[in-house]
């Protein structure tokens, strides 16, 4: 009976993984399809879509807009979120719990509510919508995810390490940059990658606050009615391969570091 349950668990895990991978595999395969539009009809294998990825109108500009928005909002959200996370863990101040609750609210609020609320604010303030308003909106909701991720890292740091730095007559700045910050780097990197992914593929909040600006998700959505260009599959596949490469590089780096620590020990 126990063996049968283990078998069912593996079957369930395989089905879940297959369900998750089907859209990705479809996108990769049909990025090589000899067709100018995405469809389920295989017309032959070709590299033309990969060698002429910017030939389709508006694909590359939309992709670059997404990279700019995701990059800038990630830097802003990571910087502010890291500072907030350290303050919430290390310092006691009035309304600390209320601040924590407010920071978690964007994570629990539906994106359509956040998007509509921000759009109304920009309208009231007379702000012209564009890449700037998208960056503001993305930074706002990404900060919460950064705080949660970095806060977990700060909470497990050994205070004795910082005390040792102070005992060696290190100034507060020296202790932070030479002791605390290096220990926080894994959490900060994880938070930055999460923020970039959330910003890059966001559609709902972006659609409310983009104005005439077109990001890659907006381009795919509007192009779906007339047929998504095959070049969009190429870009999506390239982003997926890049994400896999980053994960593998992180795992390899971690394995090498563990081996070095084991040898040193």
Which stretches of residues belong to each language-model region?
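Transmembrane-helix boundary motif in ABC transporter permease subunits
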Residues: 1-7, 71-103, 116, 120, ...
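Interhelical loop and adjacent transmembrane-helix boundary motif
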Residues: 2-5, 35, 50-58, 200-253
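C-terminal transmembrane helix and the adjacent membrane-cytosol boundary/short C-terminal tail
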Residues: 2-12, 22, 95, 151-162, ...
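Transmembrane alpha-helices
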Residues: 12, 17-24, 139-140, 147-151, ...
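Hydrophobic positions within alpha-helical transmembrane segments of bacterial inner-membrane proteins
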Residues: 22-24, 70-86, 112, 116, ...
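Short membrane-interfacial helix/loop motifs at transmembrane-helix boundaries
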Residues: 22-57, 207-211, 265
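Membrane-interfacial helix termini and adjacent extracytoplasmic/periplasmic loops
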Residues: 38, 42, 47, 112-142, ...
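Short hydrophobic faces within alpha-helices
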Residues: 63, 88, 105, 160-168, ...
